[in-house]
């Protein structure tokens, strides 16, 4: 891994430093209580923190992922070093409050770092609740999320019209670049942090480059693997705060984390990456 600390970006609403590579838990943390299933997840969490990463993003919609995240973070004594993000996905004020209270219990964290409104579900109701929770100190940051490109204009409209949103989470990758024009400029203008999900498009991008060598010129920005290239492309976008690849594989986590170190591609190199991808 390159010398020096992981690259960080400031959360615009506070200035708090956020390392650019985090961890998603969708599917991969939905496991049982047996040690065999949890051991690699423990290793992944250790690697994240030892490399300087902080963000762990989960959700009530990810099956047992919230509970597993809470268990493992507690067992490893990592709570002071991780930034726990979860979501609310329900309609109605009382159901929203109950779901968020349950998330705090499962995550073993009376104060959650970030709660996001998942897929904009009943977002006006949940946003009002989240604002109250933030005022009471039950959550440090609040946000909105979606995973489809079709939702980007609505995410942008909400950022433009609703004050006090700290984070927006969206799908963005070298293969799906709509956010570059539809959302990221608005997020930057409104000073909203951006979390990127699905940076590898659920693994589809690796199938496209299977058997193909990483270009030699990728060494110009300290990149040796396709995973690093995909992630460095994303985090080189100034509006992006953090990317959250999901993995239960310690080797993959180690590779992903390396993207957060060393040089990042400049605008000309990013254009070259786009041209390469579009030619495949």
Can you say where each PLM-predicted feature lies in the sequence?
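Acidic (Asp/Glu)-rich catalytic clusters
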Residues: 12-18, 69-81, 100-110, 130-135, ...
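Active-site groove signature of glycoside hydrolases
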Residues: 104-125
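Short, well-ordered coil/turn segments that N-cap beta-strands
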Residues: 16-21, 52-55, 78-82, 109-113, ...
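N-terminal binding-site loop/beta-alpha segment at the start of enzyme catalytic domains
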Residues: 1-82
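Active-site mouth loops of central-metabolism enzymes
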Residues: 26-39, 85-94, 119, 145, ...
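Beta/alpha (TIM)-barrel catalytic core signal, keyed to glycine-rich beta->alpha loops juxtaposed to Asp/Glu
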Residues: 119-280
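Short, acidic/polar
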Residues: 33-48, 92-108, 149-159, 226-231
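Acidic-and-aromatic substrate-binding clefts and catalytic sites of carbohydrate-active enzymes
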Residues: 31-33, 59-67, 89-96, 118-125, ...
